[in-house]
């Protein structure tokens, strides 16, 4: 009986579900494209039994949740360690905004680091005291000290408490900066850490897993960045502490967080850390991912089953580009319209498979140009719309007035669909004024000036577009036919480089914004292999 839902999933989503947070883990594992033997894959080649990983970094849709679920499942199968369930219920954005406005830029990251430290300690303590399997390992004196001596700092818990719940509890209990600082820096925390260390030495190694950052991050990116940066720094500090020998916390953070850390004065210590895994897909790894997804398709989704790869799937290897007067390889055409992430490839693959099934029923052996372009355009429009809305949310959250997190006015900027929708339409209108998908330095300066004017003094619309992968620049290498978009490890990653001759919009943007294609060379954010 359990096989029926799987057959329905296979028919409706031949490439699999796009969201790794949902679905049966075994199905996710079965559909996982393993890159552990792919030598050029970097963090993507991480094995599920690798216990050295502490931070998974990447954009939305790169697979952070799938990797974290695999790490957690592997650890939970090991009898000698305790692996908590994956946490997926972050604190409210309103709480994150409030902390960002209670403290200035010089102290907010340090404050977040302390919040995460106390929340992790409280969560670990609740696990040790509330789970009989762990509690039985503790000396009676240690258990009594933890349970009785710190009720002023840590409310009694009857069940194991997730880290996220402890963060929300800490933030919900105080509404003034000095009160929060007093709580976080109370002298009794040192005593609690001492007894917690003794408890952890007797108990099995403990692994905690913190996920679900993407959906909340995009509501107020710069505020969540500071929150996650504090989490990142605390995880790396914990790794070097005595507690970190027995307490292991594995987290997911956004690429912008790593970019911010690497730009700090201590960035070099993290650049090649074996405990940080950057899930950064390039054209080779995402091409391999696409090829594997095609290889696993059944004959029902292959227009020419006797052939392999793109040709077997869609019945063709090239497609005309009438706007530029060139022919493109189909694989190149498909991938350049994505953000080079698995989620986009899965979305696009499922949409194309639906058309393949219809064409097979009609007896066709290849997908016509116009049909292929229409499907790609429809899916790319969705990608562009999502990212434009993320840009609009970032602009809106940057406009939250001082103290907005305390007086409730922040909801107008980050909780109002009407306001964010208006910002998104304004971004579209600004992009339309560029006229084309390729333009010069003067057009970028004009875009920045118009953004400043229309968004009430907002200074950084070009940087917001750059950080979200919508705006890039053509390579200045001789005879190059590729563009550069944001990379978290780039030295200038937070700001659009101002010294380039030619700038471009991502290929999905013209499917959402009325723009003409400029030049014969299609925009692609990678160097073709």
Q: Model-found features: residue ranges?
A:
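P-loop NTPase nucleotide-binding core
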Residues: 53, 58-207, 216, 455-460
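C-terminal leucine-rich, beta-strand-based interaction scaffolds used for sensing/assembly
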Residues: 86-88, 325-529
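Flexible secondary-structure boundary motifs
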Residues: 21-41, 176-177, 297-317, 443-446
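Walker A/P-loop-proximal flanking segment of P-loop NTPase domains
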Residues: 1-102, 517, 521
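The catalytic "switch" region of P-loop NTPases
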Residues: 189-327, 376-386
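Short secondary-structure boundary/capping segments
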Residues: 98-103, 224-226, 263-270, 352-355, ...
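Short acidic, S/G/P-rich loop/turn micro-motifs used as interaction or catalytic elements
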Residues: 63, 213-222, 256-259, 435-438, ...
């Amino acid at each position: 009986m359990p096989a029926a839902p799987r057959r329905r999933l296979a028919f409706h989503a031949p490439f699999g579900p796009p969201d790794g947070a949902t679905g049966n883990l075994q199905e996710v594992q079965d559909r996982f494209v393993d890159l552990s033997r792919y030598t050029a894959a970097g963090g993507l080649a991480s094995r599920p039994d690798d216990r050295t990983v502490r931070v998974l970094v990447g954009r939305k849709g790169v697979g952070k949740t799938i990797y974290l679920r695999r790490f957690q499942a592997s650890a939970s199968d090991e009898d000698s360690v305790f692996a908590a369930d994956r946490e997926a219920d972050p604190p409210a954005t309103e709480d994150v905004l409030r902390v960002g406005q209670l403290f200035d830029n010089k102290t907010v990251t340090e404050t977040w680091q302390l919040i995460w430290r106390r929340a992790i300690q409280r969560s670990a303590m609740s696990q040790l005291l509330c789970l009989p399997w762990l509690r039985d390992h503790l000396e009676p004196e240690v258990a009594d000290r933890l349970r009785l001596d710190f009720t002023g700092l840590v409310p009694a818990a009857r069940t194991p408490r997730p880290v996220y719940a402890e963060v929300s509890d800490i933030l919900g209990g105080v509404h003034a900066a000095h009160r929060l600082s007093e709580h976080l820096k109370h002298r009794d925390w040192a005593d609690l850490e001492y007894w917690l260390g003794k408890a952890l030495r007797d108990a099995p190694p403990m692994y905690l897993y913190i996920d679900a950052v993407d959906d909340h991050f995009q509501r107020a990116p710069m505020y969540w960045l500071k929150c996650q940066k504090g989490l990142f720094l605390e995880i790396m500090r914990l790794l070097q502490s005595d507690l970190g020998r027995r307490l292991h916390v594995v987290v997911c953070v956004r690429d912008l967080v790593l970019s911010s850390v690497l730009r700090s004065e201590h960035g070099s210590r993290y650049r090649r850390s074996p405990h940080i895994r950057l899930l950064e897909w390039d054209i080779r790894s995402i091409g391999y991912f696409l090829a594997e997804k095609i290889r696993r398709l059944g004959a029902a989704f292959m227009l020419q089953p006797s052939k392999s790869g793109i040709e077997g799937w869609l019945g063709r290897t090239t497609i005309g580009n009438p706007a530029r007067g060139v022919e493109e390889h189909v694989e190149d055409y498909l991938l350049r319209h994505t953000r080079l992430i698995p989620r986009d490839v899965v979305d696009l693959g499922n949409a194309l498979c639906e058309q393949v099934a219809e064409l097979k029923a009609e007896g066709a052996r290849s997908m016509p140009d116009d049909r292929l372009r229409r499907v790609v355009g429809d899916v790319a429009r969705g990608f562009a719309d999502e990212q434009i809305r993320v840009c609009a949310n970032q602009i809106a959250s940057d406009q939250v007035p001082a103290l907005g997190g305390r007086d409730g006015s922040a909801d107008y900027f980050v909780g109002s669909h009407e306001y964010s929708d208006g910002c998104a339409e304004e971004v579209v209108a600004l992009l339309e004024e560029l006229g084309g998908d390729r333009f010069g330095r003067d057009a970028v300066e004009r875009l920045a000036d118009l953004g400043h004017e229309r968004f009430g003094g907002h200074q950084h619309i070009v940087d917001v577009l750059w950080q979200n992968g919508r705006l890039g620049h053509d390579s200045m290498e001789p005879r190059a036919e590729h563009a550069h978009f944001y990379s978290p490890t780039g030295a200038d990653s937070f700001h659009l480089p101002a010294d380039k001759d030619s700038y471009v919009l991502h290929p999905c943007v013209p499917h959402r914004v009325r723009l003409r294609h400029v030049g014969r060379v299609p925009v692609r954010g990678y160097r073709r292999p």
